Amino acid sequence: MTDSKDDKTLSVTGKKTLTLKPTGVNQGTVRQDMGRGRTKAVVVETRKRRPTRPEDERAGQPQGRVGDDAPATAAAAPVQTPAPVQAPAPVAAAPQAPRPAAPAQRVQQTNQYSQQRHPGQQNRPQASSQPSRQPDRPRGAVLHDLSASEMDARRRALAEAQVREVEDAKRRAEEEVRRQAEEVERQRLAALEAIRQAEEDKARALEAKNAPEPVAEPVAPVAETPRAADPAPRAPSPAGAKPAAGAPAPSFVRGRKPEGEDDENRGPARGGPVRGKVVRPEPAKVPARPKTEDERRRGKLTVTTAAVDEDGNARGRSLSAMRRRQEKFRRSQMQEPREKVMREVVLPETITIQELSQRMSERAVDVIKYLMKEGQMMKPGDVIDADLAELIATEFGHTVKRVSESDVEEGIFDVKDDAGEMVSRPPVVTIMGHVDHGKTSLLDAIRQTSVVSGEAGGITQHIGAYQVEQNGHKITFIDTPGHAAFTAMRARGAQATDIAILVVAADDSVMPQTIESIHHAKAANVPIIVAINKIDKHEANPEKVRQQLLQHEVFVESMGGEVLDVEVSAKNKLNLDKLLEAVLLQAEILDLKADPSRTAEGLVIEAQLDRGRGSVATVLVQKGTLRPGQIIVAGDQWGRVRALVNDKGGHVKEAGPAMPVEVLGLSGTPAAGDKFAVVESEARAREISEYRQRLARDKAAARQSGQRGSLEQMMSKLQDTGFKEFPLVIKADVQGSVEAIVAALDKLGTDEVRARIVHSGAGAITESDISLAEASNAAIIGFNVRANVQARAASERTGTEIRYYNIIYDLVDDVKAAMSGLLSPERRETFLGNAEILEVFNITKTGKVAGCRVVEGKVERGAGVRLVRDNVVIHEGKLKTLKRFKDEVADVPMGQECGMAFENYEDIRAGDTIECFRVEHITRTL
């Protein structure tokens, strides 16, 4: 008998045939579908693997390779036939098996699987001719050797699996404890809710009158028995140990299965088939879920949870909010109508329906329904007046308090002065008079400066405010322009002043702007001091000036009046001290006082947009003290005072009464002449500013719509009158100059042409101005300003014309000449003569020709003619031919006969009269 070391060798016996030993490989044939009805026979092999434990492999590795002839006593134990599998107990009762026991369990499971698949394989009789085979030899379970690194990796993986298993068990225990605590808390809250519900039922039962029902006793829900935590993992059992008859089968589940899963649908366990139905009694449990933001707000707010909630995120509801929520829930359960709350509704002059409903705490739909019942179809966004709003509010049962939008301005100029804090203040003196009478030169002589040299053309085009000191007393001077275009500036200066100095040139006497200044001073009820200037000239005549002032009710002291007059010379600085003494004397008579401790208010003298400093307003503080950091409202602009600059260019910490300063920090450029006041907060300042801006927009829209009228009126007006406009964009250095230019250009307008100011403002010419001028086909006028680089490039690209001026005379003259070009020329008609038609002839090539005799004047060829029949003009045109006999002539004098033909007209008869005239077009000017 031949014995081989390999399992696959042939063994030969004396009387036996050659056979192959079982190799653990099962073969079979299946039919594979190849498509389109074709099949193919495929051989399928099923191999059976018997894994071994790492301990057996390590024990057998030093002695040589598995399968050698060396003894293998430390190798894996032979696989025994397992006992019949018992029916497993419920899965919940079986402790979870740790991972170290898995190899042995897998061997058992594999053997069981083999036994089920091949039940007759183990009972197959063995050949009796193999007495020399060792039953303890392993049958090739390990197919290859493992290196030391692979063994270390396996050991590390096994250790990590054990650690993970312990951590998972600990985490599951902690989660179970937390779930138990949550369940207890839920049961407690359910009990409280049941008690509250019972109390509500009791209250409802007491309120019921018809059939009172007995109040059910509150039954607390039975507390569920908390489920015990998972037991600790058992120690690994020996690899070859068999399970006891009554013991549960070991579990091979690696992870925790979801709770509530039906055991009937789980299928057989890995240890063996499930014989019966597995029932695990477990109480129903509400799965925990994270709270949403709305649910976090549902808890009651107590002292301990006032800051944060249980998660440390959002604060819970207050007790009042919780009480309101419970009351709302109770009303919804009882279906009680909500109690009507009567409110006091504040109604402005106009209000939208949506805002009115919000102030009444009513639904806008209800208000719309009420209006529909009254026959008014409106939407929530429609604006209604105060009368209709009051009617609606009264109908809904509310009281009404009507206010005006102008109430936001109440109190800002009504601050009362403290009589105990009143102190003397410097007088405010305005220098007024005709242009070129030396007002600015006089002020320069007083201030010992040279402002007039910096003025273009030697005339003042701004209001300048300065403060000088004389004998320890301060005097505030305001210099106003004398040109006719600056009427508003002079009026503004007269309103802000205490004393007016009327400057009259001794060599020029009283002029129109002098008279206007007198009227402004009298309208403002301001005392006048006459300063007769230029007495150093030879042609000076002060007496003539005094006599002319009498005609305008200005009585000087030398003429028996009360008006002080001083003869001065600004050039030679003569009698300037006398003029200042007269000012101080007049101020002493007026007894000027102010309260510096109150909030400041005053007047905006001038405003401009500076490139480096932004909006700069020259203001005159009339009351109180202005300091940096205060919030002021000037016209429709507001801002926080960033800095105060005096007339010398220095920064000051405060500006007292009668002190002129420049204010930096406004949000925009206010209009000259606006009043300013200090307010307590930015919100109040913003509210006042928005109201004034809205009011200005409404006024501008009303003015524009009133001028425009309907579309039909516009078209008919253009067709009838041929009205033309000269669009302009005006930019100046200060707001006062803009006003003067606009006023001067408005005076140039006539019924046929006028200047249309597309935009005007203070500041440099920008690219947006170029775009606006291009869109409106307007010219740009810059007064003491220039265009920046971007604006110049845009003007060259678009072809927009920019004109720069620094003297208002030149500006007005150029605009006047340009507007004159828009005027249609005047049509002037000159009568030439009359001719009477004696006979009408038909000429083949010419048509009808009238044989006429000139009875008055003369008739010229090419002149205009009218055909008059029965004193009615029936045709007007030109002569086509004029012949005397057969010759073309230029004209025919009176008493001679001629032949005439008309252009494109032949309805002529004998006895008609032909009137000849000449038309001339004459260019007009404004």
Curated annotation (Swiss-Prot):
Pfam families in the cross-refs: EF-G_D2, GTP_EFTU, GTP_EFTU_D2, IF-2, IF2_assoc, IF2_N
Annotated spans, G5: 569-571
UniProt binding sites for GTP: 433-440, 479-483, 533-536
Region annotation (G2) ranges: 458-462
PROSITE patterns: G_TR_2, IF2
UniProt-annotated stretches for the region G1: 433-440
Sequence ranges assigned to domain tr-type G in this UniProt record: 424-591
Region feature (G4): 533-536
Extent of Low complexity compositional bias: 13-24, 70-96, 211-251
Functional note: One of the essential components for the initiation of protein synthesis. Protects formylmethionyl-tRNA from spontaneous hydrolysis and promotes its binding to the 30S ribosomal subunits. Also involved in the hydrolysis of GTP during the formation of the 70S ribosomal complex.
UniProt GO MF annotations: GTP binding; GTPase activity; guanosine tetraphosphate binding; translation initiation factor activity
UniProt protein name: Translation initiation factor IF-2
PANTHER family noted in UniProt: TR-TYPE G DOMAIN-CONTAINING PROTEIN, TRANSLATION INITIATION FACTOR IF-2-RELATED
Gene3D superfamilies: P-loop containing nucleotide triphosphate hydrolases, Translation factors, Translation initiation factor IF- 2, domain 3
Organism placement in taxonomy: Bacteria, Pseudomonadati, Pseudomonadota, Alphaproteobacteria, Hyphomicrobiales
InterPro entries from the UniProt entry: EF-G-like_DII (IPR053905), EFTu-like_2 (IPR004161), IF2_assoc_dom_bac (IPR013575), IF2_II (IPR044145), IF2_N (IPR006847), P-loop_NTPase (IPR027417), Small_GTP-bd (IPR005225), T_Tr_GTP-bd_dom (IPR000795)
UniProt similarity note: Belongs to the TRAFAC class translation factor GTPase superfamily. Classic translation factor GTPase family. IF-2 subfamily.
Keywords: Cytoplasm, GTP-binding, Initiation factor, Nucleotide-binding, Protein biosynthesis
Ranges annotated as biased composition (Basic and acidic residues): 151-185
Gene source species: Allorhizobium ampelinum (strain ATCC BAA-846 / DSM 112012 / S4)
Span list, region G3: 479-482
Localisation: Cytoplasm
TM stretches of this protein: none
HAMAP family in UniProt: IF_2_B
